[in-house]
Design a protein with these regions (language model features):
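Conserved beta-strand signature within the Rossmann-like core of class I S-adenosyl-L-methionine
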Residues: 26-40
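Conserved Class I S-adenosyl-L-methionine
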Residues: 73-155
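Acceptor-substrate binding/catalytic loop of class I
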Residues: 51-63, 104-106
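Short alpha-helix
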Residues: 57-80
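Short, glycine-/aromatic-enriched active-site segment of Class I SAM-dependent methyltransferases
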Residues: 36-56
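A conserved beta-strand element that flanks and buttresses the S-adenosyl-L-methionine
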Residues: 4-5
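Short, catalytically relevant binding-site loops at active-site mouths
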Residues: 11-12, 36-40, 85-86
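A short, conserved alpha-helix within the catalytic core of class I
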Residues: 10-27
Length: 155
């Protein structure tokens, strides 16, 4: 393939294997898009998981893990980072609780109360309801895996 890419999909136990497969399949450019910081839902999980479930939340790998693995593999990608303000908009507090209940595995009234208090302290009026804003950073790592004469080089 001329271009092989993965978009926010490398939360795999065998990251090296996934990268090797992309390199093998690509005759042009490999591009990996991944978070360079916490997305809003992971920030909420990091904040609430201990209170909800009694254990810390362990976020998945981010772009720096992918970069470091590529570096150890002898791949030196071009890296670009962009950011935007993610806005979770809900009509009211109840809808906010409902929107996050499943992701946070909220099952009991006590857990719902924890989530409700968290959102009540953070949702702000805006637009068509209540808004939870969060700055999201994304990275693009690009490289050319195959070159005549051997070796790997960034694009």
């Amino acid at each position: 393939y001329d271009v092989v890419f993965a978009s926010f999909s490398l939360g795999t136990p065998d990251l090296r294997g996934a990268i090797e497969k992309m390199n093998e399949a690509c005759s042009g450019t490999v591009a990996v898009f991944h978070f360079a910081g916490l997305p809003y839902w992971e920030q909420i999980m990091l904040d609430l998981w201990p209170d909800l479930h009694g254990v810390p939340y362990l976020p998945g790998p981010k772009a720096e893990i992918i970069f470091n693995l590529l570096y150890r593999m002898g791949i030196y990608p071009d890296v670009s980072v962009s950011s935007y303000e993610h806005r979770l908009t809900v009509p009211d507090l109840d809808a906010g609780v409902d929107a996050l209940r499943g992701r946070l595995l909220v099952e009991t009234p006590e857990q719902e109360g924890i989530l409700r208090r968290y959102l009540a302290a953070r949702l702000i009026p805006g637009g068509d309801g209540l808004v939870l804003g969060h700055r999201v950073h994304r990275a693009c790592l690009r490289w050319e895996p195959h070159r005549p004469g051997g070796g790997l080089r960034a694009v």
